[in-house]
Amino acid sequence: MPKAAGDAKLLIQSLNKAYAATPTNLKIIDLYVVFAVATALVQVVYMGIVGSFPFNSFLSGVLSSIGTAVLGVCLRIQVNKDNKEFKDLPPERAFADFVLCNLVLHLVIMNFLG
């Protein structure tokens, strides 16, 4: 087996081992972020196949999905117990910030739709 393939296999095994120790609430947030990014990718593929006639609708959908994913990553950073920067921030406050920012994001997206 080539050295690069062995290194890649070792890297994947170490990532799987480290991710197995991740708390369940962080795994749920990760799943949410992956779903939001997958939704954006589906919208881009759909636009490539069918077309983007109401371009502002396409742009709103993609920006909403990507914005939601970014806010999900921010929530994950704030809720992570290993992150020393946000150790004094309670998870309830982080979730309230996430909900409020999502509300503002989607109000802006709805305004952009017209």
Curated annotation (Swiss-Prot):
Domain of life where this protein originates: Eukaryota
Keyword Membrane included in the entry's annotation: yes
Residue ranges crossing the lipid bilayer per the database entry: 31-51, 55-75, 94-114
Membrane association type: Multi-pass membrane protein
Any one Gene Ontology BP term: protein N-linked glycosylation
UniProt keyword Membrane, yes or no: yes
Cytoplasmic-side segments: 1-30, 76-93
Keywords associated with the record: Apoptosis, Endoplasmic reticulum, Membrane, Transmembrane, Transmembrane helix
Cross-referenced Pfam families: DAD (PF02109)
Subcellular location: Endoplasmic reticulum membrane
Family per record: Belongs to the DAD/OST2 family.
Assembly mode: Component of the oligosaccharyltransferase (OST) complex.
Name under which the protein is recorded: Dolichyl-diphosphooligosaccharide--protein glycosyltransferase subunit DAD2
Lineage per the UniProt record: Eukaryota, Viridiplantae, Streptophyta, Embryophyta, Tracheophyta
